Amino acid sequence: MCLRLGGLSVGDFRKVLMKTGLVLVVLGHVSFITAALFHGTVLRYVGTPQDAVALQYCVVNILSVTSAIVVITSGIAAIVLSRYLPSTPLRWTVFSSSVACALLSLTCALGLLASIAMTFATQGKALLAACTFGSSELLALAPDCPFDPTRIYSSSLCLWGIALVLCVAENVFAVRCAQLTHQLLELRPWWGKSSHHMMRENPELVEGRDLLSCTSSEPLTL
């Protein structure tokens, strides 16, 4: 008998779970770098608690960093789970972290959309608060401006756009990872019937496989 998970063999299921975890790790690192760049190029000049808009920028950036860390952790856990599928605590860890990733990424995406909308609505005044002239129409370097006002507006929107795309991608792959671990846990409210299907194989072809592979004597329950 051969164990199948969601229409996939155990080997294919492991590969899909591992690739999903790798994608989450990569996305998390890129998202973390993007948030760090935004902090270094923008927030260190405009992050003043007195300005509500600037404070909102800081909160969204902190949320982006937190989301990136959780995404990386969830991706690593998914990779480990692809090697140790029978571990029930690890299954629950990956499932809960994936759900947390999806929620954080969605919240982060909404926050980034709000930041972009507020920047357009205020014409970037919060970004130029550190400059004495305080107007986005004066696109020239000023002695009392600690940065180049001709670039901070476009740089902020560019970094926010990249971060928004990353958050959406993180949400998609986090949901996919949660779906895969959901199949392992056999939680019925979403899929109804069990996702485990049995298929007969030639006993000679299954010799030498590990405990999670097909066996000729009895089906294996994860």
UniProtKB/Swiss-Prot annotation:
Tissue expression remark: Ubiquitously expressed in cancer cell lines.
Keywords: Membrane, Transmembrane, Transmembrane helix
CC per GO annotation: membrane
Subcellular location: Membrane
Membrane topology: Multi-pass membrane protein
Listed InterPro entries: Beta-casein-like (IPR020977)
Pfam families from the UniProt entry: BCLP
Keyword DNA damage carried by entry: no
Transmembrane segments: 22-42, 62-82, 100-120, 155-175
Amino-acid biosynthesis in keyword set: no
Family: Belongs to the TMEM54 family.
Official protein name in the record: Transmembrane protein 54
